[in-house]
């Protein structure tokens, strides 16, 4: 039996700097855009404008340098997952589709981050970009807003002022929905949420029918718990990150824009804010941020960042400046 290696044998060669044992690979924007390789631009300026959220300035350069490389990475991971399916079929000795009808298993992506950070735009961009790959053209996007308890139920529970916190969601219904889709079920329904009414739309649903990829976007989708959580079903996840001070500013700027647009709708829940001046609107937005959105970010959302497969870090101009990707 060979003698065990001694400490001197095991020690790495001196390199002048400590080895990097971080679980992440860290890229600046210039390094990340090189990973696009030869991928062509597949979106037009008009499409980017249509996908852009309030207060954001995403353009074709941002798509080319940030989101095309990300689309390529996810595409490669989807292909790898499909190869695993083939390996399972080889083990079973038959096509899983013949042995288990309806066994189509989609690749599930979670997109998380704070209010106003731009996660919805990221999710929409990923949906469109991933649809352009011929090997997985069916990409569905569902937001967790539809799984918020109805306003009446939130009032009954006394948590209307905790809307957006983990306890305000019907976690069991969300988990059941993603489990059903992941299990290959046909025509799985998700509730629809109205930002105008600030509530679920009674009797209205979207139907997800065996997509190649499902994107689940929401504040708390990377939450963990003592039992199975929706994050346990993700094959890949993205966390959209930024400095807290920048997110607060974006939130206030968005609130002012909504005051001049969506809040003016006759049925808008926040119609009473439509006619207030800039100073008052800014004060209201800052109070909402400080009392609700900031505590939720600090207590519940930000701690889940470490669970993401990839972190998009934005600078003050709302554009991605760094990308962190998990090695493991």
From Swiss-Prot:
One of the entry's Gene Ontology molecular-function terms is: ATP binding
Q: Which GO terms describe its cellular component?
A: cytoplasm
Q: Where is the composition biased (Polar residues)?
A: 1-12
Q: In which pathway does it act?
A: Cofactor biosynthesis; coenzyme A biosynthesis; CoA from (R)-pantothenate: step 1/5
User: What Gene3D superfamilies does UniProt report for this protein, alphabetically?
Assistant: P-loop containing nucleotide triphosphate hydrolases
InterPro entries (alphabetical): P-loop_NTPase, PanK, PRK/URK
Reaction catalysis annotation: (R)-pantothenate + ATP = (R)-4'-phosphopantothenate + ADP + H(+)
Q: Write down the superkingdom of origin.
A: Bacteria
Q: Where in the cell is it found?
A: Cytoplasm
Q: Which family does it belong to?
A: Belongs to the prokaryotic pantothenate kinase family.
Entry protein name: Pantothenate kinase
Q: Could you tell me the gene encoding this protein? A: coaA
